[in-house]
A protein has these predicted regions:
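Non-catalytic helical/linker scaffolds that mediate oligomerization, partner binding
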Residues: 1-477
Length: 477
């Protein structure tokens, strides 16, 4: 059985060589993430060019995702490598541009002293160090250390429950987006999205640089993003549940419930939902995952996530290939236990369906009734395939498209196996070509039942209006 839940791997120093990238693709990497919070353009371009060379030589549609640094707040540098803070210590954050020491450190946001108040909690390094604001004196925020720890330069700052008036895009983000357009990235994973206007701002920048065909995945990382999830989902092409910062900004115990709710909303929209952060975190150091991590990945699959993601496990861990292999095994085992018919019955068609809704729903129902081996979907923009897969059919969906960009973008959609095809000029040819491609790729064999969907006029996005069910017969092609 073909794996339906897709896997994203973050590239980094641990997978620098073309040979390692080839091994990742063979093992099951569907998309490669480039984390622009680290490294410069030259470093990322080197990895990107290697990946493109490898995926082209293997003829595999591996998508590329540029993950922005986003409008975050960090501490700046110290006069030593690191400092140690203990509970009860007094420690100061300042918006002045000074070199830090054991008593104070500068922050990257120049207006932080205007937006915090006495009594507020400030978390540093994903909450490993906790401060309580005592008083504000000019540009200095004097705090008491509540949870001590070791601090080094450039660690993140979170202030739970406080809306900080940061811009949606920084100058670095704009430069990075331009780089993504110039180098043909498939997706922008936009960090710290708080409202739909943030997504629209990114679309404007993409349009300015000629990147209208790059899709936006909004990362939900704070309470404001959670509160505005419906409008963000509407404005975006996909959602990432970024559980690292999200679990710092809101109580960690609430994250599993939010994960389920966000995935459920994404399912209804047909847009891909990525579950990310610390999924197999122990495999950065160890060759096997913990039992809790195995359960975490499996439960994301049971929730219906489109993708699961590896971050530090593949970017900088000691066991990148083993981490991916472990994730593939967990996903496949979890998928085998899913009752797709029961799941399909839960995913009702929309209250006011259009023709496309009815056709894609009927495709899945017909495939279930006939126990079809595959659904074959001719799609110009990729939307038809995504709309089919929101109903989570038991069989895989072969998506035929004439655009290489669309082929790669479909690589992160649940259950979709995208193929590139030439131009066609008749519906009969669409149907026969769909079967030919599925046969060639080994998805079906002679005697299998398939359900095919397409639309007329040919080549027009959103025109899906035809269904055909047939037995595969090579002699009739």
């Amino acid at each position: 059985m073909l794996r339906k839940t897709k896997i994203i791997c973050t590239l980094g120093p641990a997978v620098e060589s073309e040979e390692m990238m080839r091994k990742l693709i063979r093992a099951g990497m569907d998309a490669a993430r480039f984390n622009f919070s680290h490294g410069d353009h030259e470093e990322h371009l080197g990895r990107l060019n290697k990946l493109k060379a490898v995926r082209d030589s293997m003829s595999r549609p591996v998508a590329t995702i540029m993950d922005t640094k986003g409008p975050e707040i960090r501490i700046k540098s110290f006069d030593v490598k690191n400092i140690s803070l203990e509970a009860g210590d007094t420690f100061t954050l300042t918006t002045e541009d000074v070199v830090g020491n054991g008593e104070r450190v500068a922050v990257t946001y120049p207006k932080l002293h205007e937006e915090v108040k006495p009594g507020m909690e400030i978390l540093i390094d994903d909450g490993l160090v906790a401060l309580r604001v005592e008083e504000i004196q000019g540009s200095e925020i004097r705090c008491t250390v509540e949870n001590g720890g070791t601090l080094s330069a450039n660690k993140s700052i979170n202030i739970p429950g406080v809306h900080i008036h940061l811009p949606a895009l920084t100058e670095k983000d704009i430069s990075d987006i331009q780089f993504a357009v110039e180098n043909d990235f498939d997706f922008i994973a936009a960090s710290f999205i708080r409202r739909a206007d943030d997504v629209r701002s990114i679309r404007e920048v993409l349009h300015r640089f000629g990147g209208d065909n790059i899709q936006i995945i909004s990362k939900i990382e704070n309470q404001e993003g959670v509160d505005n999830i419906d409008e963000i989902l509407e404005a975006s092409d996909g959602i990432m549940v970024a559980r690292g910062d999200l679990g710092v900004e809101i109580p960690a115990a609430k994250v599993p419930v939010l994960q389920k709710q966000i995935i459920r909303k994404g399912l209804r929209s047909g847009k891909p939902i990525i579950t990310a952060t610390q999924m197999l975190d122990s495999m950065i150091r160890n060759p096997r995952p913990t039992r809790a991590e195995v359960s975490d990945v499996a439960n994301a699959v049971f929730d219906g996530t489109s993708c699961v993601m590896l971050s530090g496990e593949t970017a900088g861990g000691k066991y990148p290939l083993e981490a991916l292999t472990a994730m593939v095994g967990i996903v496949e085992e979890a998928e085998q236990s899913i009752n797709y018919w029961r799941q399909f019955q839960k995913h009702r068609i929309t209250p006011e369906p259009n023709i496309n809704d009815a056709i894609t729903h009927t495709c899945c129902l017909t495939a279930m009734d006939l126990n079809a081996t595959a659904i074959l979907a001719a799609t110009n923009s990729g939307r038809t395939a995504r709309m089919i897969c929101r109903f989570r059919p038991a069989c895989p969906v072969a998506a035929l498209t004439m655009q290489e960009k669309v082929r790669r973008q479909l690589a992160i959609s649940w259950g979709v196996y995208p193929f590139l095809t030439g131009e066609v000029n008749s519906t009969d040819r669409i149907f026969s070509l769909s079967v030919e491609c599925a046969l060639k790729e080994g998805m079906v064999k002679n005697g299998d039942t398939v359900v095919i969907t397409a639309g007329v006029p040919l080549g027009r996005s959103g025109s899906t209006n035809l269904i055909k069910a047939q037995i595969v017969d090579e002699d009739m092609l």
